[in-house]
């Protein structure tokens, strides 16, 4: 039968066991960070501080947090309740990628959702932060959030003093904000505003469309122009000599990499460009939670702590690990690995957990303790 015991008590006791054996991951300048937490009974408590890692361990044991956070900012007086009194000294640059902000088609399993978010995270790190912006790999820390996403911490002297507006410029660039068929040609022609991966990808795709114009006619051009009957006369006009060009057609100019072609766009060309920009944004943009990045006083999950909605550990990983990372295998709390618990399921539930597909049937099931904690925390199950 289903227990009358409150599952919250069961979860708190499990978390208590974890924090008793907890060895916190080292955090630089932890004594200059604000600490916050959400207990099992109550709301967020902020403006705490610790003297070092040993004190942090004791803090976890005493409070048994459902969620444990630390500030991405450094302060002279992190325990002060008024933000101005904390005396801000700088902050890491943070990117939060979460399933709440990323479209995942269909009705995916939890682990499949994590795969999609992981791909966005890897793209952000490799294509934008490293390749495009040129950040030092050693300055980047990636952590699995313990829930449905990843956090990226950038630690660099060139970053710490950036204000919110400067950080917003970075998020706007990564998300491709402000790119449209009017602004892009203008920024290309005057050499301002857009460089790097966006310029390269849009220009490459533009050239490709007009190089493969015959195969493009029945798909992209039709969608862009909004009327299949407009495609043939449009292509015919492209084959004519371009205005301002002594001998070349617009089609020839449009197939050549570089900024020249954007000086010859008419209204229909801009419709095609708008469609190309939309497709490129869909392909390479990264959906990040902008308020997290722009907030220079942000609290974020502490590495090594448990996520209260999953029981999974907030886990640091390197960039190579991110390429094939499986949080539901790698982020399980070792203290629970040899125990089981009986749970009652109102409905069947399928998940890849611990590297294996697990089909949990409706009714009573005996499952590994960490999986049971996950199901209880997700409110997918009840204790029996």
State each model region's role:
Residues 110-137:
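Long, well-ordered alpha-helical scaffolding segments within enzyme catalytic domains
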Residues 172-289, 293-296:
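Long, charge-rich alpha-helical interaction segments
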Residues 379-384:
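A short, conserved structural fragment
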Residues 78-85, 129-144:
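Catalytic micro-motifs at enzyme active sites that drive phosphoryl/nucleotidyl and oxygen chemistry
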Residues 374-375:
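Basic amphipathic alpha-helical segments that dock to polyanions
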Residues 92-95, 135-165, 169:
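Histidine-centered divalent-metal-coordination microenvironment in nucleic-acid enzymes
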Residues 17-107, 290, 310-312:
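SsDNA-processing nucleotidyl-transfer enzymes
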